[in-house]
């Protein structure tokens, strides 16, 4: 699980940032959901993290990290 996007955008060129944010907002369900993931009110699934990393890779950004992450442990 992960949340927070400041680190994602720290090395992004100014002309790429609006497009990347817009595509992320669309994927995550709009402005409200984007900011919930950004502020940790919701956690990104591994699938969502992979999608975002692929999106950034399409714009030639490969070394990206989310602000926070944690592993969920399954206790049986």
Which ranges hold each PLM region?
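A short, Lys/Arg-rich alpha-helix, primarily the initiator
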Residues: 1-22, 62-66
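DNA major-groove recognition helix of helix-turn-helix/homeodomain DNA-binding modules
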Residues: 46-64
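Helix-turn-helix/winged-helix DNA-binding modules
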Residues: 15-16, 26, 44
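The DNA-recognition helices of helix-turn-helix-type DNA-binding domains
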Residues: 41-42, 59, 73
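The alpha-helix within a helix-turn-helix
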Residues: 21-25, 53-56
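Short, charged recognition helix plus adjacent turn
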Residues: 66-76
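Recognition helix of helix-turn-helix/homeodomain-like DNA-binding domains
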Residues: 29-45
């Amino acid at each position: 699980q992960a949340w927070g996007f400041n680190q994602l955008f720290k090395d992004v060129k100014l002309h790429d940032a609006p497009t990347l944010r817009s595509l992320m907002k669309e994927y995550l369900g709009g402005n409200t959901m984007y900011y919930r993931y950004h502020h940790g009110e919701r956690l990104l699934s591994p699938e969502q993290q992979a999608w975002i990393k692929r999106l950034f890779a399409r714009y030639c950004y490969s070394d990206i990290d989310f602000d926070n992450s944690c592993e969920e442990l399954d206790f049986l």
